[in-house]
UniProtKB/Swiss-Prot annotation:
UniProt record similarity statement: Belongs to the TolB family.
HAMAP family: TolB (MF_00671)
Annotated keywords: Cell cycle, Cell division, Periplasm, Signal
Name listed for the protein in its UniProt record: Tol-Pal system protein TolB
Function summary: Part of the Tol-Pal system, which plays a role in outer membrane invagination during cell division and is important for maintaining outer membrane integrity.
Pfam families assigned to the protein according to its UniProt record, in alphabetical order: PD40, TolB_N
PANTHER family: PROTEIN TOLB (PTHR36842:SF1), PROTEIN TOLB HOMOLOG (PTHR36842)
Length: 453
């Protein structure tokens, strides 16, 4: 069983599932001021906030086209959060646009809008534009926030995501995940067999690109903390090597090569170290730390057991990992020197692919029991364990930067006669708001980036 689990972890381990913690901060819709009042949400359910996103004022056709595109992305971002319910523009009563005037709040109240977004776009030179937007509290008739961004025309989509993040932050009190990216392994079929390539895309599936050519088998890609590099394992002539791909320059180089099987590379939070799992002896796997500044390699685990799937805590002082030292596959926590090892899970079943939340309060995992796979979260003291995703073969959770959303992969067959499909899904930490993230082909091993500036 342990051998099978090791193989599974080298294939689809560390996939990204998105976790929403039980608490959201929502706007007190009957407040008389713009003070935000936190509301406790349980079971991932809350009344969605009706929001009207007015078309941004524009003069030229070029500006008008950008206005429509940006508003569409903002609306889509806020809608998939399940916190907001964008109101159709067909219902808008007031037609005046822009940020200079005071809205006719009674007109927006009539269509039940709690929040109103007004904006305008201006071309400032041959390549750049300026967008300004205002977030209004309709009930109190007060301005919540006003911001501007300058951007080149080709970056209109990321600018829209930034605006959505700002709206989410100022209304809910929490940061959003809209201006982020996802890296994963794409798998397609050819006459020569399966082609596995590392792909990268925006969190909504747009701007999809491949960063490897499919000549070599690849697994477990992850972003560097600054989002500039992708760390992954590539098998050339069946020999595994840890490689790093620079997203800015396109340079791709070998970072480390071990005897045996190497997998599950992970960056430290400061980006100066990486952890890898290496199996050079049958049924024995250890975790190693590679210092990227000095090149020194340090073995962190000892003994004759399998130790794999390391995941740093947000401050880098602790490491969650998987081991079979107790006779079953469980999750443990140790310090960054390999000491003070404590067992986190102890219930029936195998626990794999630990992923430490960026908010430092949960560890996500894959559980395998009686042939059934599930995704769950558990507190750092081993309490409050809950399963948040099941059905078919689900694996490899990865956190969004807000610490509330998890991405993961699910393998399934639509019918017994059809081929297996592997797709990406996100879900909040309560197990609600699950949605498929569209990809062109089969997808596994997802990892969520940090927020882009």
């Amino acid at each position: 069983m342990i051998n099978n689990l090791s193989i599974s972890m080298t294939k689809v381990i560390k996939i990204i599932l998105a976790i929403i913690i039980i608490l959201f901060n929502t706007l007190s819709i009957f407040a008389n001021t713009t003070t935000l009042s936190p509301i406790k949400i349980t079971k991932g359910n809350c009344t969605q906030i009706p929001i009207a996103i007015n078309f941004f004022a524009a003069k030229s056709n070029e500006e008008h086209g950008l206005s429509q595109n940006i508003v569409s992305i903002i609306s889509n971002d806020l809608n998939i959060s399940k916190i907001f319910a964008p109101i159709s523009s067909d219902l808008f009563i007031e037609t005046e646009q822009g940020v200079a005037h005071i809205p006719l709040f009674t007109a927006w109240s009539q269509i039940n809008a709690n929040i109103l977004i007004n904006g305008e776009i201006t071309k400032i030179d041959s390549t750049d534009f300026k967008v300004t937007f205002v977030v209004w509290d309709v009930f109190s008739a007060k301005e919540i926030t006003r911001k501007s961004f300058t951007f080149p025309s080709q970056l209109w989509r990321s600018t829209a995501h930034k605006i959505a993040d700002q709206i989410y932050k100022h209304v809910t009190g929490s940061k959003g995940n809209f201006n982020t990216k996802i890296v994963y392994v794409s798998e397609s079929n050819s006459s020569k067999g399966k082609i596995r390539r590392i792909a990268i895309m925006d969190q909504d599936g747009a701007n999809h690109n491949y960063i490897t050519n499919g000549k070599n088998h690849v697994i477990t890609p992850v972003f560097s903390p600054n989002n500039n590099q992708i760390l992954y394992v590539s098998y050339h002539n069946k020999i595994p090597t840890v490689r790093i791909h620079d997203l800015n320059s396109g340079n791709n180089k070998i970072l480390a090569s071990f005897n045996g099987i190497t997998f599950s590379p992970r960056f430290s939070p400061d980006g100066n170290k990486i952890l890898v799992s290496n199996s050079s002896t049958k049924n024995v796997t250890h975790i190693y730390e590679i210092n990227l500044l000095t090149g020194k390699i340090k073995q962190l685990t000892k003994g004759q057991s399998i130790n794999t799937s390391p995941s740093y805590s947000p401050d880098g002082s602790k490491i969650a990992f998987v081991s079979d030292r107790s006779g079953s596959t469980q999750i443990y926590i140790m310090n960054d020197q390999g000491g003070n090892i404590k067992r986190l899970t102890s219930q029936p079943g195998a626990y794999t692919t630990p992923a430490w939340s960026p908010t430092n309060n949960y560890i996500a995992f894959t559980k395998i029991e009686a042939g059934e796979f599930s995704i769950g979260v558990i507190k750092l003291d081993g309490s409050n364990k809950r399963i948040i995703a099941t059905k078919h073969l689900v694996e490899g959770p990865s956190w969004a930067p807000d610490g509330k959303t998890i991405i993961f992969s699910r393998a399934y067959k639509a019918t017994k006669s059809t081929s297996t499909k592997v797709k990406l899904y996100s879900v909040d930490c309560t197990g609600y708001n699950e949605r498929e993230i569209q990809t062109p082909e089969n997808a596994s091993d997802p990892n969520w980036s940090n927020e882009y500036e």
